[in-house]
Amino acid sequence: MEYGGGTQNWTITRDNNSWIYAANNSGLLQFDGYSWHLFSNGMIIRTAYHDGKERIYVGAFNNFGYFSPDEKGAMHYHSLSDSLEDKYRNFSDVWDIYCIDHSIYFVSYNHIFKLTNDEITVIQSKERMLCSANINGNLYVFKENAGVFLQTGQLFIPLASTEKISNYHISEILPYQDQKLLLITEYHGIYIYDNSTTVPLITQNDSLLKSSQLYCAEIKDD
């Protein structure tokens, strides 16, 4: 089926009508079950997140904001990053968006932009953040050559012992049993973080995991 979008979809979100929205190289794609619609804001959209109401939050290069419908249902883009001070404008791509405690978090490489009641707070990181995850209302980030951190307030709290695998590119952080974390690396297998220790998870597929690039992962109940 021709959908009229670009060649790559980065993330997918769904609204209360079960309509699908895809962050696409050509803009925001909407599928209502019958047909595709493209809403373009002239940017490659890297990530999209539906807030459970009427907004589809999106992130792009040096820009983030939201699409919302007009009285006829047509989606229009509203930039939030346009209100930033000039010194914060060059933040590169926004790759992840989360809702935590009624605030929206936009995560780029060196900045987290927290939207609360239409006000934006800027949280800066010296190291590049290459991966992030919202786990049980906690925002975790992997910082290049530094390890995994819990972000809270304006602070990044290091998870002890994760620095020993900080030169491995962690591509995914997942919840695991008994409040542990699974740290998925691109070429060095899977690690378990348990309070203060980080150890390899030995599996029958270790050779495959270490010879393949692990770009994303998900926990399944079965």
Language-model segments: which ranges?
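Carboxylate-rich, polar loop motifs that coordinate divalent cations or form catalytic acidic clusters
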Residues: M1-D222
